[in-house]
């Protein structure tokens, strides 16, 4: 069904995410233990856009946990950090000072490309710190080497776990008092297409933080 105005554009979404434990220190097995209630509602489903991935988000004062679960994929993920547009990848945008009426990214906004496999790193998962168009300034140089990732291949898909330490997010130190973050993501798949969180790329979701979803941090 074609919509003149996408239904999800008619709502101001504020979703709650639970508090989680720190990531596992082990080098095998699950990196993150995601609590009940961490799976996000995907507003894009209201717009008849593709739906093939679950997105789970949780937090604690030391960082942010994100898990992407892709289903219905006919082959293993592929990709390279040298050509993100042609890769299986999840694009994340995070704002540690969401205002709701600011249309240009501030120094509190961050953008990461998270690859389940990177052929230039022995097919291990990888994160690439990305610029945001028209961003006013940055206060912290996020370093991908401090972001922990783990991929679990499954029949017909994969799980990608990402732990972003608060040290890599400007303004995260005060996040407990603020109680919310701005968040947006797009899951890009070479077989299944693109699944945005709310709106397709006809809208400026890649650089306008007022279009991102607010995540309320619960204890």
Where are each of the predicted segments found?
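Structural preference for beta-rich elements and adjacent junctions enriched in aromatics
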Residues: 1-219
């Amino acid at each position: 069904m074609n919509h003149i105005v996408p239904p999800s554009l008619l709502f101001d979404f504020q979703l709650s995410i639970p508090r989680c434990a720190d990531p596992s220190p082990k080098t095998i097995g699950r990196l993150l233990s995601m609590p009940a209630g961490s799976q996000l509602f995907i507003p894009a489903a209201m717009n008849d856009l593709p739906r093939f991935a679950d997105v789970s988000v949780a937090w604690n004062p030391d960082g942010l946990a994100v898990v992407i679960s892709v289903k219905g994929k006919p082959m293993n993920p592929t990709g390279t950090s040298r050509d993100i547009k042609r890769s299986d990848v999840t694009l994340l945008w995070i704002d540690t000072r969401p205002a709701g009426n600011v249309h240009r990214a501030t120094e509190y906004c961050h953008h990461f490309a998270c690859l389940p496999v990177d052929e230039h790193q022995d097919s291990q998962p990888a994160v690439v710190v990305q610029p945001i168009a028209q961003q006013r300034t940055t206060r912290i140089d996020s370093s991908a080497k401090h972001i922990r990732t783990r991929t679990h291949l499954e029949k017909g898909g994969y799980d990608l776990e990402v732990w972003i330490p608060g040290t890599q997010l400007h303004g995260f130190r005060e996040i407990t008092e603020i109680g919310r973050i701005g968040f947006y993501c797009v899951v890009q798949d070479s077989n299944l297409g693109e699944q945005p969180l709310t709106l397709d790329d006809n809208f400026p979701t890649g650089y306008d933080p007022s279009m991102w979803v607010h995540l309320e941090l619960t204890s």
